[in-house]
Amino acid sequence: SCSLVGSEMCIRDRNNCVLIDAPADPDYILGEIESHGLTLKKIFLTHGHFDHIGAVADLVDRTGCEVYIHIMDKPKLTDDAGMLANLFRIRGHRNYTGKVNVFTEDDILKLDELEFDVLETPGHTSGSVCFICGMNMFSGDTLFSRSVGRTDMPDGSSTALMKSLMKIADLGGNLTVYPGHMNVTTLDAERKYNPYLRQAADCLLYTSPSPRD
């Protein structure tokens, strides 16, 4: 079962849970986790911007949980410029300098019996990913309801994002999509109403090999 923690998702297996992204309010996050009788074991980060990693240091200090991030975004955990804290003039945050587990698309992340496939989706950042667990996708700042993440900031790339959206458009099934911001949606709804994902789907049609006669 799933428990909503702010705009992030807490995935439960037995009484353990994994937090997908950790915005800067550890007291609220822990309060929500404790109210559901859960124990935080791991944090999976979709990318390394401050509004997704701000509570990591405090949560690790208070729970001993493990931290996972894509290898390309690991440097952002300790780089104020890379995490955009300088750009948005964020003050008083704690950088996380402890142990980090890095992954790539070749890895499967686990919490007890739950398995999370990693879909590399660079564009918003070079190390942006989506996590897929069963029929649920946690899309970070790659895919939103009717929109997508910005690419006009350092380490962003509109070309890379379009390629990532093509990967998402090519996924099978009507996944429930939990974005890093805005409302929960579904992959079918985004295929129909999201102009960026529709463009990506059109690109797939033009780039797919023609069937042989």
Pin down the residues of each PLM region:
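Residue-level detector of beta-strand structural context in well-folded domains
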Residues: 7-8, 101, 106-107, 129, ...
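Single conserved hydrophobic/aromatic residue that forms the stacking wall/gate
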Residues: 1-6, 11, 206-213
